[in-house]
Amino acid sequence: MFFDTIAAISTPLGTGGVSVIRVSGNNSIAEINKIFKGKDLTKTKTHTITHGFILNKNQTILDEVLISVFKTPNSFTGENVVEINAHGGILITQMVLERVLSLDIRLAFPGEFSQRAYLNGKMDLIQAESIMDLIHATNENAIKIAHSGLQKYTSQLVTSLRDQILNLIAQIEVNIDYPEYDDIPQITQQKIALEVKSLIKQLENILNHSHKNRYLKEGIKTLIVGRPNVGKSSLLNAFLNETKAIVSDISGTTRDFVEAYFNCQGITLHLIDTAGIRKTDDPIEKIGILRTEKMLLQAELILLVLDQNNHLQEEDIQLLQLTKNHPRIIIGNKADLKSDKLISSLSNNSSQLAPQEIISVSSLDKTGFLELQQTILKKFQLNDIQPKDFNYFSNARHINQIQIALRSFQDLQQALLQSMPIDIYSIDLTKAYQALGQIIGDNQENSLIKELFSKFCLGK
């Protein structure tokens, strides 16, 4: 429970029709009433709006406002909350805030309103983080995922898993503490193994969907690679329908990364055009090539571009080898030239590349671009998204805790195979239970809570 009253501007600072100053604390209504000319706010009902004026210290009018009152416990923070709807100018908003802070009210820390809502039991940690995700959403899918978190679908996943784990721990502990009681159901290693197998399956399913949700929310980091002059920059420009990257017949034109974003049927592709990889004596081009090779390790998808108008070159073969263990799609560019040189050369090289692996495209007339987009979505299992698919995690912190829980169960499986004593099993079960608890904020450390909420904007 907090005893001080806090305030902050909740709307973006700038010129607009209305700005909102949010005030929270058990004394917030009484304090704002001291500087308000209009109906007595202490006597208003909760969830009501009152017209009036904010007064200066000399009792002159500072601004004409609408005051929204939300009384505990039915407010965002769980405390008494007042929202002052003032005129939206930068100066007048700041002056109203300063007048509020002249009372027994202090400026809120970033995220403190949401932190109070969490600590007062108005939301769990997933819901709090979903608010931040909603504010920073960059596409429609990210909004849907955030709404799923706010509606507690993901919280229910965690709660269900924890209930199953707690029930299993309880059965084990009862059998250890009271082995002599005949009316207590006996827990066997076989039964524990079946329960653990089911929990592992559930966690693996959650992880699979959560990884997809991360792509839905954040997009796919996509590296465009190839030897010089195969049309990498032309491909980037074709995606965007604009000249983002310089296109030239001179090899080595692109020496640094050129980045852009493309909406691939609802999925964001973070496209990165890279320096063409080849042997060169140019020191600047060498730096670009080295950076490209490092970026290969960070890419979530590689678009390897080959030139259909040329036979497979040694540099192409080296790139095919370099990227063979990475998620990649091979593109045959310049399809508009109607050349079969690339395909005809496949049988005479060591690349072991089959013609059907190549998606034929033209950066000039957009031939094959729809097929390329569909191939990308299919590769990441994003080609048939259903509403229920959004009811999983996308936050890296949540996914990490799911992975910790999964590893605990995998360790438990090994202990079961080795027929270890039954009391040992509770150790891994407890680890998994605590890892999942970290997601919703159960027994969360204060330092982590402060860190999470400090990332929120002021006034939220």
From Swiss-Prot:
A single BP term in Gene Ontology: tRNA methylation
Keyword field contains tRNA processing: yes
Subcellular location: Cytoplasm
Binding positions for (6S)-5-formyl-5,6,7,8-tetrahydrofolate per the UniProt entry: 22, 83, 122, 460
PROSITE patterns noted in UniProt: G_TRME (PS51709)
Gene3D superfamilies: P-loop containing nucleotide triphosphate hydrolases (3.40.50.300), Probable tRNA modification gtpase trme, domain 1 (3.30.1360.120), tRNA modification GTPase MnmE domain 2 (1.20.120.430)
Keyword terms of this UniProt record: Cytoplasm, GTP-binding, Hydrolase, Magnesium, Metal-binding, Nucleotide-binding, Potassium, tRNA processing
Residue ranges occupied by any TrmE-type G domain in the UniProt entry: 219-381
Pfam families to which the protein is assigned, alphabetical: MMR_HSR1, MnmE_helical, TrmE_N
Amino-acid positions noted as binding GTP in the UniProt annotation, renumbered to this chain: 229-234, 248-254, 273-276, 333-336
Cofactor(s) in the UniProt record: K(+)
Any GO molecular function: GTPase activity
Gene Ontology CC annotations of this record: cytosol
EC number: 3.6.-.-
Enzyme class: hydrolase
Binding sites annotated in the UniProt record for K(+): 229, 248, 250, 253
SUPFAM superfamilies, per database record: P-loop containing nucleoside triphosphate hydrolases (SSF52540)
Annotated cofactor note: Binds 1 potassium ion per subunit.
Quaternary structure (record): Homodimer. Heterotetramer of two MnmE and two MnmG subunits.
Family, similarity comment: Belongs to the TRAFAC class TrmE-Era-EngA-EngB-Septin-like GTPase superfamily. TrmE GTPase family.
Function per UniProt: Exhibits a very high intrinsic GTPase hydrolysis rate. Involved in the addition of a carboxymethylaminomethyl (cmnm) group at the wobble position (U34) of certain tRNAs, forming tRNA-cmnm(5)s(2)U34.
Designated name of the protein: tRNA modification GTPase MnmE
Protein's organism: Onion yellows phytoplasma (strain OY-M)
